[in-house]
């Protein structure tokens, strides 16, 4: 009985310290994908088909009408009213480096991570050029919880 009480007290202590530490979150995965004229990144739900279609769109830039960043993220213990994802994209058009920042509030959902989308389409995509680097961050108010960036992000200066 004493072991049970001690275990219960230890569990209560650990849970209370986790609550005091504040929220935590993580950007798990970022997938940049081109969109075709119908707004699709794939012709079917198959991952193989998606990768093959993305390779086809890379070889045929005239068929691209947009860019989508699919972001897998997760968070817990955060103030959901202040939590947001921010995507920063750097593109090269002729000799001009363009930086676009997109933000999206996140909503509480399930225990596991959730996917969010950032779309760059229309005139914005036409002025953006070729994607050179990206960075996605998860924020709770003014506090950055997590970050994931492409390997070229640090090597490409912002303008």
Please provide the spans of the model-predicted regions.
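Solvent-exposed serine/threonine-rich low-complexity stretches and specific carbohydrate-binding patches
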Residues: 98-109, 150-152
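Short beta-strand elements
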Residues: 144-159
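Short, solvent-exposed, Trp/other aromatic-anchored flexible loops in extracytoplasmic proteins
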Residues: 107-130
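Contiguous beta-strand segments within globular domains
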Residues: 42-82, 113-120
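Internal, hydrophobic beta-strand segments that form the core of beta-sheet-rich folds
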Residues: 130-147
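Bacterial N-terminal signal peptides
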Residues: 7-16
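A eukaryote-biased signal for short, well-structured alpha-helical docking elements
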Residues: 22-44
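Extended low-complexity, serine/threonine- and proline-enriched intrinsically disordered segments
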Residues: 79-99, 136-138
